[in-house]
Structure formats: C-alpha cells, structure tokens
From Swiss-Prot:
Family: Belongs to the UPF0246 family.
GO biological process, any: response to hydroperoxide
Biological source species: Cronobacter sakazakii (strain ATCC BAA-894) (Enterobacter sakazakii)
HAMAP family for the chain: UPF0246
InterPro entries listed in its UniProt record: YaaA
PANTHER family assigned to the protein according to its UniProt record, in alphabetical order: PEROXIDE STRESS RESISTANCE PROTEIN YAAA (PTHR30283:SF4), PEROXIDE STRESS RESPONSE PROTEIN YAAA (PTHR30283)
Cellular compartments per GO CC: cytosol
Listed name of the protein: UPF0246 protein ESA_03332
Length: 257
C-alpha cells in the first residue's frame, strides 16, 4: 500500500529532529532544472506568479539562490519533519518510532512541485513552489508539463518495490493532477472526510487536511497492507460510512465536535 500526501507551505527547520537517519531525493536533477528557471525571476515576478507578498517573494528568491544540491543534515532536513501544515499536524511524524519511519519510508510518498516525489527521510532544502504554479520551463507552460510522466514512473517503482498494487490517494487535487492514473500500476483508493456542521456533513478544508494526516499515521502505526483494513479508521471521532461510499471512494464522517 502506497500513501500519497501533499507537501505544506509552512516549514520547520528549528525543532529537534526525531531521527538522524536520512536519504537523498531521487529527482534532484529535475529539481536543479527548476531552480535554474526560478533563479531568473525577479522578486516581483515571484510575487505575481505565486500570489504572495513582496516580503514572502523576497524570502523565496533567497531560497532559490541559496539552494545547492549537496544536501547534508547541516543544510537540509528530512521532508517528513520539515513540512508543518495541517496534514502534518495529523501525521505527527515527530513522535514516530524507528519502526514507524521504516514503514513510512517504504509506504509513504510526498508529492512536490520542486522535488517531484519525496520519501519521508529524503533531505530537502526549504522552498516554496506549489504544483499548480504556472512556471514556464523548456518543457511547457507549467509544472504539470514539466513533470510529465516522471512522477508516475517514480511511484510505479515504489509500488513494485513494496509488492502490492494499492495507492491510497490522500493528496489534494492540485497535487494528484501531477500523477497519470491510467499509467499507475495500482488500484487507487480515495478516502473522503466529511465533518458535520449544522446537521449536514461536508468537507471542511482544515479538518479534511488534518484527517489525511491522521489516516496516514493510522496506516503507518497499524502497518496496514490491504484496502479493506482502512474502514476501521477511527482516529479523533471519524467513522466509516459504508452507505455513502462507492467503488474506490471511502467516506468517513465525524459528528459535530
């Protein structure tokens, strides 16, 4: 079972590390190509491209310029410990055991606009480059055209290595769009998380993102390998709703808190 999640805009390079083990990203040559393009942008162009403030644009211009591919624990951090958004609040990788990191390294992948695909222990230097960014490269008008089938090929390698053909898509639509489902050698399971508000169940972004992290952690902690095992997920009050689920879409609900 291979879990896919999105990265986060919020990064943490200060907290104590939960592990000293690390690996190197597998698509650094591609990342270098994107860095070369991004370095040619002015602060103002970055601000417009990413719809961010001039202060954030300046920070990201500095990150692009400081980026250099000789990643060490001194200038980079393991991806699963560097990302700090809502998904990662649910995941809580900082409390993983060594065995959890082992399982996650084989069964969890983070999709990334800059790095393509990251394993949990892959070192990464700080960046901001969301998959939906319309950064033109020699390969096309945006990052989807840049990555083409590369991400899918890398995921297929991971699927083959772990020996089963199930992908649990816990990534956002923006990121999963970089994957070619028809060329993925796997059955794709898509969990959906609905929270009750005023008597109606609906997707509430903050809760849904955190739930993706909670389910990722649940799979890792329980060493799940089969899709049917996912229906037992019950973290923080969620429960499987068979009546609302259909095909490969698994619906989980939670009553108003």
């Amino acid at each position: 079972m291979l879990i896919l999640i999105s990265p986060a805009k919020t990064l943490d390079y200060q907290s104590p590390l939960a592990t000293t083990r690390f690996t190197q990203p597998e698509l650094l040559d591609h990342a270098q190509q994107l860095i070369d393009v991004a370095r040619r942008l002015t602060d103002e162009e970055i601000a417009n491209l990413m719809s961010i403030s001039s202060k954030l644009a300046s920070l990201n211009a500095t990150r692009f310029n400081d980026w250099q591919p000789d990643f060490t624990p001194d200038n980079a951090r393991q991806a699963i410990l560097a990302f700090k958004g809502d998904v990662y609040t649910g995941l809580q990788a900082e409390t993983f055991s060594d065995a959890d990191f082992d399982f996650a390294q084989q069964h969890l992948r983070m999709l990334s606009g800059l790095y393509g695909v990251l394993r949990p222990l892959d070192l990464m230097q700080p960046y901001r480059l969301e998959m939906g960014t319309r950064l033109a490269t020699p390969k096309g008008k945006d990052l989807y055209s840049f990555w083409g089938e590369t991400i899918t090929q890398k995921l297929n390698e991971a699927i083959a290595a772990q020996g089963d053909n199930v992908v649990v898509n816990l990534a956002s639509d923006e990121y999963f769009k970089a994957v070619k489902p028809a060329k993925l050698n796997a059955e794709i399971i898509k969990p959906v998380f609905l929270d009750e508000k005023n008597g109606k169940f609906k997707v509430i972004s903050f809760y849904a993102k955190k739930a993706r992290g909670l389910m990722s952690r649940y799979i890792i902690e329980h060493r799940l390998t089969k899709p049917e095992q996912l229906t037992a997920f019950d973290s923080e009050g969620y429960f499987f709703d068979e009546a609302s689920s259909a095909g490969n879409e698994l619906v989980f609900k939670r009553h108003e808190q």
